[in-house]
Amino acid sequence: MPSLKDLKNRIGSVKNTRKITKAMQMVAAAKLRRAQEAAEAARPFAERMTAVMTGLAGSVGSSESAPRLLAGTGSDKVQLLVVMTAERGLCGGFNSSIVRLARAHAAKLLAEGKTVKILTVGKKGREQLRRDLGQHFIGHVDLSEVKRMGYPVAQGIARDVLDRFDKGEFDVATIFFARFQSVISQIPTAQQVIPAVFEGEGEVNSLYDYEPSEEGVLADLLPRGVATQIFTALLENGASEQGARMSAMDNATRNAGDMINRLTIQYNRSRQAAITKELIEIISGAEAL
């Protein structure tokens, strides 16, 4: 049975831990608010661009003059997986859920006889995937120095991906990230970005004249579309990470409080037992006299 001193030290240690987790929860809440605002600010631009490209893609269709980023290479043999995770942990199952989805997708592709290449964004995903898929790594993007996510970061990643596509290094590119729904709900998502996939209705092209041509405008917009999708995914990931961290630290703070209560009860009982024992010894000694 632990001594009173040991129990007191444990209570003090857990109280210090609770202070840390509470502070991390408050910091995550502030960062989450900023991340949500950034995602909401970028959404109208992304939606408008997607609508225009969807309309153009519908007009261009599968014609021979369709841009390569839309038509593809005609093969899906080589697949690039861009796995986006956080640089830090202590955010519940945020990182592992994205990695789990990417790992399952890679296993499915490998079982079909396809070639898999992996580009990691964020340290935590790279650490987890290295164990069984490290031989498929072709690059890594370090975000440890990025204080606030901006469009230039997404442009850099998109430029690397597009350069690899132009060199014929892969046929299909899919990004993996967590779509933010709420503080307690982040949905692991796989989204194909190359060749471009458009769903729903776009802009009515009869209202516009495109120069030099619809194909030319679409060819110019598609690389920007890839960067925009990556930027949106990074913003969603940022909000999801902070939401998951806020939830995890809230749980840790409440668990620490429960542990403090249990240890305090144990401490009081041990102290009471020690006092009772001393009183019995004093009374027994007095009776012996």
UniProtKB/Swiss-Prot annotation:
One of its GO terms (biological process) is proton motive force-driven plasma membrane ATP synthesis. The keyword Coiled coil does not apply. It is found in: Cell inner membrane. GO terms for molecular function: ATP binding; proton-transporting ATP synthase activity, rotational mechanism. One of its GO terms (cellular component) is proton-transporting ATP synthase complex. InterPro entries: ATP_synth_F1_ATPase_gsu, ATP_synth_F1_gsu, ATP_synth_F1_gsu_CS. It is a peripheral membrane protein. PROSITE patterns: ATPASE_GAMMA (PS00153). CDD domains: F1-ATPase_gamma. Its main location: membrane. Keywords: ATP synthesis, Cell inner membrane, Cell membrane, CF(1), Hydrogen ion transport, Ion transport, Membrane, Transport. F-type ATPases have 2 components, CF(1) - the catalytic core - and CF(0) - the membrane proton channel. CF(1) has five subunits: alpha(3), beta(3), gamma(1), delta(1), epsilon(1). CF(0) has three main subunits: a, b and c. Produces ATP from ADP in the presence of a proton gradient across the membrane. The gamma chain is believed to be important in regulating ATPase activity and the flow of protons through the CF(0) complex. PANTHER family: ATP SYNTHASE GAMMA CHAIN, ATP SYNTHASE SUBUNIT GAMMA, MITOCHONDRIAL. Belongs to the ATPase gamma chain family. This is ATP synthase gamma chain. The gene is atpG.
